[in-house]
């Protein structure tokens, strides 16, 4: 199943199809909008194939709220595995397992169902769109691990290197398709 993709070409496709939005969501921020990438058939295929390489060997893909749902489902379909949506707090009916993490101002929670799915002992790869500060990815890895999953790694489309998210998720191995 594993193919070897031209990483420079994958990175070029991502860079070409990423829209930059100045001063969003607040002044001074250069928002990276991946919507054009995901809406482009070739862009979605290139990203899905490359993330599927990263997730090869997993028997469950965990997609993070919200664009990670799209990517995770595409990767799981390519690999022939299931997908688990790791939701923001308050979106799932009880009972749930949750993990709280720090935001710049306050806290947030991620949740997964506590019933109906058994992730104990399963090899899980986490998929998301962007690695920024690493808080969400670290919380997801902690949550899944606390529920008995073997989190083998993570794959993201875009890494904002200056925000040092990779350090926040260490020792979890993260592979990024495009780093800026």
Curated annotation (Swiss-Prot):
CDD domains per record: PRTases_typeI
Reactions catalysed according to its record: AMP + diphosphate = 5-phospho-alpha-D-ribose 1-diphosphate + adenine
Compartments where found: Cytoplasm
Pathway assigned to this chain's UniProt record: Purine metabolism; AMP biosynthesis via salvage pathway; AMP from adenine: step 1/1
Recorded GO CC terms: cytoplasm
Catalytic class of the enzyme: transferase
Pfam families given in the database record: Pribosyltran
InterPro entries on file: Ade_phspho_trans (IPR005764), PRibTrfase_dom (IPR000836), PRTase-like (IPR029057), UPRTase/APRTase (IPR050054)
A Gene Ontology biological process term: purine ribonucleoside salvage
Assigned keywords, A-Z: Cytoplasm, Glycosyltransferase, Purine salvage, Transferase
EC identifiers of the protein: 2.4.2.7
SUPFAM superfamilies referenced in this protein's UniProt entry, alphabetically: PRTase-like (SSF53271)
GO molecular function: adenine binding; adenine phosphoribosyltransferase activity; AMP binding
Function: Catalyzes a salvage reaction resulting in the formation of AMP, that is energically less costly than de novo synthesis.
Family to which the UniProt record says this protein belongs: Belongs to the purine/pyrimidine phosphoribosyltransferase family.
Subunit structure: Homodimer.
Protein's UniProt name: Adenine phosphoribosyltransferase
Organism: Mycolicibacterium smegmatis (strain ATCC 700084 / mc(2)155) (Mycobacterium smegmatis)
Gene: apt
């Amino acid at each position: 199943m594993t193919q070897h993709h031209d990483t420079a070409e994958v990175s070029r496709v991502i860079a070409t199809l990423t829209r930059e939005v100045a001063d969003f969501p607040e002044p001074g921020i250069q928002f990276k909008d991946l919507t054009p990438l995901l809406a482009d058939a070739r862009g979605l295929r290139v990203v899905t194939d490359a993330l599927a390489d990263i997730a090869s060997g997993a028997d469950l893909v965990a997609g993070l709220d919200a664009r990670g749902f799209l990517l995770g489902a595409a990767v799981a379909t390519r690999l022939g595995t299931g997908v688990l949506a790791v939701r923001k707090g308050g979106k799932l009916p009880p009972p749930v397992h949750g993990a709280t993490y720090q935001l710049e101002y306050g806290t947030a929670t991620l949740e997964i169902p506590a019933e109906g799915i058994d992730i104990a002992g399963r090899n899980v790869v986490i998929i998301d769109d962007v690695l920024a500060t690493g808080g969400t990815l670290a919380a997801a890895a902690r949550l899944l691990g606390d529920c008995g999953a073997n989190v083998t790694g993570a794959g993201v489309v875009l890494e904002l290197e200056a925000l040092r998210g990779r350090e926040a998720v260490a020792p979890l191995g993260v592979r990024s398709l495009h780093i800026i």
